[in-house]
Amino acid sequence: MMNNNGNQVSNLSNALRQVNIGNRNSNTTTDQSNINFEFSAGVNNNNNNSSSSNNNNNNNNNAQNNNSGRNGSQSNDNGNNIKDTLEQHRQQQQAFSDMSHVEYSRITKFFQEQPLEGYTLFSHRSAPNGFKVAIVLSELGFHYNTIFLDFNLGEHRAPEFVSVNPNARVPALIDHGMDNLSIWESGAILLHLVNKYYKETGNPLLWSDDLADQSQINAWLFFQTSGHAPMIGQALHFRYFHSQKIASAVERYTDEVRRVYGVVEMALAERREALVMELDTENAAAYSAGTTPMSQSRFFDYPVWLVGDKLTIADLAFVPWNNVVDRIGINIKIEFPEVYKWTKHMMRRPAVIKALRGE
């Protein structure tokens, strides 16, 4: 998508571009947020109080009784709707557990013969959050195997997998070296990996030994998992998967993605300016005065990072989603040049290339 070196990144880009546009379920089996509009309708409390001006006390009492009845009816209706929805959800869960026709043998066999060490990553070929975890595993040099679940076979509903991730979504990770500890939610997995690496080696690779920096890394990581990924996911959903074409929804989520990128762009631009002013001392005065554009600095293409002066999970968490954002009509090279350079630096890393290829 964004490499000037020819086929290297254009090839690996295909690893994430196989988004299975025809599979409407693929957007609901990753750990991104999905808005449930079933509960968006609130109770209408605007009662008709015209009878309150009537001087007849009986009419006033009748009006109050009628209003009370309406409120009670509305509350009952909403309560019944919620109960019905919960019952439907329970029945769906039961139906999944009763699906005797679904072949779970591959998943069942794995859990019967689990490895004694390393990691097992459960992912999907179309799940950016799964590739996010693979990138960090690769960067840290951890030995891992990936099981790409087949959603069409319902493998994510296999009881053994649900025991790993009760949300029945990907990614999920098993740490075999910690008595087959299971971790789910991509952000939680990344934090587990960097903290374990730090504990085992004393090297805060992709992390930090400074509490202030750790807090900033967490902030950006949570920003990515709660704002960046879900908004791109929703924009993709309403553009490609939704049963109806709702232009306002596509526009709303695409605009929100642009807002999110604006936040990242500003942070990276501030770090770029600080870097150039620190390293390019002979031209710093000209940059400050505005007589020479900062873009002319030989340090203008040097990598900058969200936290501190090194790559962390705060940066890497964005990579797989940045690699598919053009599918919603956003050209980060033109609209967000610092985000583009930042992403390009990360996508050229051997561990990232390996992970995005699914190796």
Curated annotation (Swiss-Prot):
Alphabetized InterPro entries for the sequence: Glutathione-S-Trfase_C-like, Glutathione-S-Trfase_C_sf, Glutathione_S-Trfase, Glutathione_S-Trfase_N, GST_C, Thioredoxin-like_sf, Ure2
Keyword Ligase among record annotations: no
Stretch forming the signal peptide: none
Span list, region Disordered: 39-82
Domain (GST N-terminal): residue spans on this chain: 117-201
Keywords: Nitrate assimilation
Domain GST C-terminal: 210-359
Bias kind Low complexity: ranges: 44-81
Cited Pfam families: GST_C (PF00043), GST_N (PF02798)
BP terms from Gene Ontology: nitrate assimilation; regulation of nitrogen utilization
This protein's record includes keyword 4Fe-4S: no
GO molecular function ontology, one term from the record: transcription corepressor activity
Reported function: Plays an important role in the cellular response to the nitrogen source. URE2 gene plays a major part in the repression of GLN1 and GDH2 genes by glutamine, and is required for the inactivation of glutamine synthetase. URE2 gene product may catalytically inactivate GLN3 in response to an increase in the intracellular concentration of glutamine.
Family membership: Belongs to the GST superfamily.
Subunit structure: Homodimer.
PANTHER family the UniProt entry points to: GLUTATHIONE S-TRANSFERASE-RELATED (PTHR44051), TRANSCRIPTIONAL REGULATOR URE2 (PTHR44051:SF3)
Record's protein name: Protein URE2
The organism of origin for this protein: Saccharomyces paradoxus (Yeast)
